[in-house]
């Protein structure tokens, strides 16, 4: 299997110093809402700001397993970015208990899109799941092995060549335990675009 590299920036601040990045617990004064969901409901999501070339960027992020940060801006207009080290992000449903279901996403934006569907009930999505965010194609082997431990694995990858290749490869690996979720957002590049289209339609009524 040959996968094209995801075109995603990895920002490493000068000299390895963390002075340019600030991580805070979400508060009322911090970023409270993205796509209509209160991100403070998710303890794994933090308020993140970083400074680069005299400009400060604000948004939210989660910490991956290599202590890097998967960052998205408040308005979701830019691509997600990894600050420091790339790595898989594992978000268990419960800290001390592994679910028998796993949802795998290409990036954090699709994870937030899923949470929007879960909250607003636009369409039915699986619940009571653990979550894994791949973030970079170099993490593919890691996520494929992790999925072996679950009874059901829901695959939320983009409807592009790379996403379809990953979906098919994981489907072949997990067999009947894998559910391809990209038909849900057929006609859209990814889950985020699908959710944004639903919100536009809903708000225009």
Spell out what each predicted region is.
Residues 23, 101-103, 153:
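Conserved hydrophobic helix-helix packing surfaces used for dimerization/oligomerization
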Residues 32, 114, 155:
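Terminal peptide-recognition signature
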Residues 51-146:
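Phosphate-handling DNA/RNA-contact segment within nucleic-acid enzymes
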Residues 30, 112, 172:
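Surface-exposed charge patches
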Residues 118-205:
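TOPRIM fold recognition
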Residues 2-88:
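Basic, glycine-enriched DNA-binding surface that flanks or lies within the catalytic cores of DNA
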């Amino acid at each position: 299997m040959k996968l094209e590299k995801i075109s995603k920036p990895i920002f490493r601040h000068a000299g390895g110093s963390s002075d340019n990045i600030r991580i805070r617990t979400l508060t009322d004064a911090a970023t409270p809402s993205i796509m209509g969901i209160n991100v403070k409901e998710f303890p794994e999501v933090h308020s993140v700001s970083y400074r680069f070339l005299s400009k400060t960027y604000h948004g939210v992020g989660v910490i991956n397993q290599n202590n890097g940060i998967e960052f998205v801006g408040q308005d979701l207009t830019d691509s997600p970015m990894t600050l420091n080290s790339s790595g898989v992000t594992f978000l268990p449903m419960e800290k001390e208990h592994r679910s028998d279901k796993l949802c795998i996403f290409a990036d954090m934006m699709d994870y937030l899109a899923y949470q929007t569907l879960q909250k607003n009930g636009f369409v039915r999505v699986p619940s009571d799941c653990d979550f894994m965010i791949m973030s970079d194609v170099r993490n593919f082997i890691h996520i494929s092995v992790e999925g072996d431990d679950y009874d059901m694995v829901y695959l939320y990858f983009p409807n592009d060549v790379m996403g379809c290749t990953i979906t098919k490869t994981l489907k072949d690996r997990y067999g009947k335990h894998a559910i391809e979720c990209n038909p849900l957002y057929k006609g859209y590049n990814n889950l985020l675009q699908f959710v944004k289209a639903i919100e536009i339609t809903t708000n225009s009524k």
